[in-house]
A protein has these predicted regions:
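C-terminal or mid-to-C-terminal helical accessory/interaction module adjacent to the motor/catalytic core
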Residues: 73, 95, 137-221, 256-260
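Intrinsically disordered, low-complexity regulatory segments
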Residues: 1-164, 168, 470
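Metal- or metallocofactor-binding catalytic centers and their adjacent structured scaffolds
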Residues: 234-267, 273
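Conserved short loop/turn motifs at secondary-structure junctions
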Residues: 2-5, 103-106, 183-185, 256-265, ...
């Protein structure tokens, strides 16, 4: 009997696939049955090797060794994943395995995960591709009924390979170069560095912003509030207020315009991450994690998509989903829905995967048993689908213009004619008590009936003081939008996206910036740290330009479509890397001090009186000729089970003694409170002793 070897990206997905295709017999590292062997990777089983693998000298960071440009790429298997790789290789080598099915995630990264394993194992057997957008049983069955030749995805693999190798070249060389120059580990990335630059540029604009005061005179006439234009001078505003209070107000024009707000598009990953951050405060990574979990539970379609449409042939699916969701969701109860599906169907705007929508399995199961974050995210996706097919929001915008005391005043109002999709949206947000959106404009009020030429004798007036506002700091919502547009603020909504990273990678980029200490979260805001600001300012434009990096991403997309040359792309990256090393061989002494860690003063040296600083492993005197040093791992404290913390060190330096709780007796092992004395004899090592003991 011959077998097809199916390789999934992770065990949970493998189990779902095995259950559908009948591979129900568990083996060590795989499942078997019905002519299939189903096994799995554990994420990236095989990765590009570190620089030190190519040459022993690359294990140390030296400028003279740069640039590092591998001629023949090498790969490694992490020790903790070697067993599963060996399982896959042995399955590939079985004589009864005649072919493979690549069932990793249907995207660029999933393709790379499979191909690296396939090549590292030296496999030459033919393989097919499972390409699905849902983990529902029906979708898996349909996917296996329509498997595609693996060679159809060779271009996608080349794109993924170029991305991985380009990230390696830029990351390894630029990180080593600038770390060597500035004497501090400075992680540089092809995508993360331009993203950091976007944050730094925004904070620079905020810090340099000069606010300006202005005034607005507001009048009330006939129950309507109308406002003047901005007035810079306070005295002028007060004079106008006084004049208005003794003058007539005359309505000189009334305009009424019917306006329509079309329903929103469905979610792609980026718009889902943005809205989940805005409404629930989820980070981009949290949203992706929740979406992936829901996908694997068969309740949500494939999340790593850049499309906001469904394919034309999905009309029956969309109709079934909407009719099933409508009675299921409390916030939709009682609303009349005449769904219009034309706006959500467009096969021309779907490449690899359609928009994110709930599955029919969710319609059958509901929200029971889900974690709170999963419930919120799934409900958000359901709401978006219903909003997208609901009626447009229609209202009448009214603008009334008045003259009073020789000045012009404007009143604005709106009358809702058809609530449409906005009523659904309002109900959803109310049901989940979503975070308030500070940037949302005040809702316009309805204006009373008014006609041109109408006069008002009784006018009240007031002056309000205002200030021009700086740009707002980025949140994950607004930064994801900026990444999608490569930092450009003036692109039209329908412009072709040439963004930083991909929907699938942006979350990890933001997390890495935080982990590296270049960005910090403060509430919902993402703010560059001092090191982050300095790094973005000292790096050359070739590494920090969002537009340039977006062009690379566009070229990677073209490679995936077979429209660009992988070798040409990599040659360009290598040339850029050579130029980088050649142009940055040295920097000024002042620049070298940019990333020096600010030393924390603990106290005064008992020997010479200079400042004592905290180091990584000790507390040391700042006077280089003085040898005073207190080691954090001093045997005295280790034997007594206490960490030699800065508070103890500071007390010893100030008073020569420190009260310490919980010292461990070296005789009995019991703890006690005591006073530690600094017994410095002026030698190489500092001594300590306990003055007194008091049992607990």
């Amino acid at each position: 009997m011959s077998y097809q070897l199916v390789i999934a990206e992770k065990p949970s997905v493998a189990r779902s696939i095995a259950g559908v295709i009948g591979a129900d017999k568990k083996q060590d590292g795989y499942m078997e049955g019905n002519g299939y062997l189903v096994s799995w990777c554990i994420g990236h089983l095989v990765s590009l090797a570190d620089a030190g693998t190519y040459d022993e000298r690359f294990k140390k960071w030296r400028y003279d060794d740069l640039p590092i440009l591998p001629q023949q790429w090498q790969y490694i298997i992490p020790n903790d994943k070697k067993k599963q790789f060996d399982t896959l290789r042995s399955l590939m080598e079985r004589p009864d395995v005649t072919g493979l099915v690549c069932a990793t995630d249907a995207g660029r990264e999933g393709e790379l995960i499979f191909r690296f394993v396939y090549q590292m194992a030296g496999c030459k057997k033919p393989f097919q591709r499972l390409w699905i957008s849902s983990m529902e049983d029906a979708a898996i069955k349909d996917g296996f009924a329509h498997l595609k030749p693996g060679t159809d995805y060779d271009n996608l693999y080349q794109s993924a390979l170029c991305r991985a190798q380009a990230d390696w070249l830029v990351g390894i060389n630029a990180t080593r170069l600038f770390s060597i120059l500035y004497h501090k580990t400075l992680t540089v990335g092809r995508v993360q560095t331009p993203t950091l630059k976007i944050l730094v540029d925004r904070e620079t604009k905020i810090s340099s912003f000069q606010k300006e005061k202005y005034h607005i005179v507001q009048i009330v006439a006939g129950g309507m509030e109308a406002a003047s234009e901005r007035i810079g001078n306070a005295d002028d505003a007060k004079a106008l207020k006084s004049a208005c209070e003794t003058a007539q107000a005359v309505c000189v024009s009334v305009t009424r315009e019917e306006k329509t707000e079309q329903p929103p598009r469905l979610y792609d990953l980026t718009t889902l991450q943005r809205e989940a951050n805005r409404l629930f405060g989820f980070t981009a990574k949290q949203t992706l994690d929740y979406a992936q979990q829901l996908y694997e539970k068969k309740l949500l379609t494939y999340p790593r998509t850049d499309s906001q449409y469904l394919t034309d042939d999905m009309l029956p699916t969309a109709e079934s989903l909407v009719s099933g969701l409508w009675p299921l969701l409390p916030f939709a109860a009682g609303l009349d829905l005449s769904p219009q599906f034309g706006r959500v169907l467009n096969s021309k705007k779907v490449s690899d995967h359609h928009a994110i929508v709930p599955t029919m399995e969710f319609v059958q199961k509901g929200l029971d048993g889900l974690a709170e974050g999963e419930k919120k995210l799934l409900s958000l996706v359901c709401c978006k689908l219903l909003c997208a097919v609901a009626a447009p929001h229609v209202y009448e915008a009214v603008t009334a213009t008045f003259t009073c005391a020789g000045n012009t005043f404007t009143a604005k109002g709106k009358t809702i004619l058809t609530p449409g999709w906005k009523e659904l949206d309002r109900r959803f947000k109310a049901s989940f008590k979503t975070d308030a959106d500070d940037t949302a404009p005040e809702p316009a009020r309805e204006l009373p009936e008014i006609t041109e030429g109408q006069t008002f004798d009784k006018v009240t007036a007031a002056v309000t003081e205002h200030f021009t506002a700086p740009p707002k700091s980025y949140t994950e919502d607004t930064l994801l939008s900026a990444m999608e547009r490569a930092g450009a603020d003036d692109l039209p909504e329908d412009a072709e996206r040439q963004g930083l990273g991909t929907p699938a990678t942006r979350a990890s980029i933001l997390e890495k910036l935080v982990q590296m200490g270049f960005v910090e979260r403060r509430g919902k805001q993402l703010l560059p740290t001092k090191d982050g600001h300095n790094l973005a300012c000292v790096l050359p434009e070739v590494l920090t330009s969002p537009q340039l990096t977006a062009q690379w991403e566009t070229e990677l997309t073209a490679i995936a479509k077979g429209q660009a040359d992988p070798e040409g792309f990599m040659a360009g990256i290598a040339e850029m890397t050579r130029g980088l090393i050649a142009n940055y061989s040295q920097i000024s002494e002042d620049a070298q001090r940019l990333f020096q860690t600010e030393r924390v003063v603990i106290g005064k040296c008992p020997r010479c009186g200079e400042s004592v600083y905290e180091g990584k492993k000790n507390y040391y005197c700042g006077n280089r000729s003085c040898q005073f040093v207190m080691w954090k791992n001093d045997r005295f404290f280790e034997e007594r089970g206490k960490a030699f913390i800065p508070k103890i060190a500071a007390a010893l330096l100030k008073d020569g003694k420190a009260k310490v709780k919980g010292l461990r007796s070296m005789k009995t092992g019991k703890t006690y409170d005591g006073t530690v004395l600094l017994a410095d004899t002026g030698g190489k090592y500092v001594n300590y002793r306990v003055e007194q003991r008091g049992k607990n």
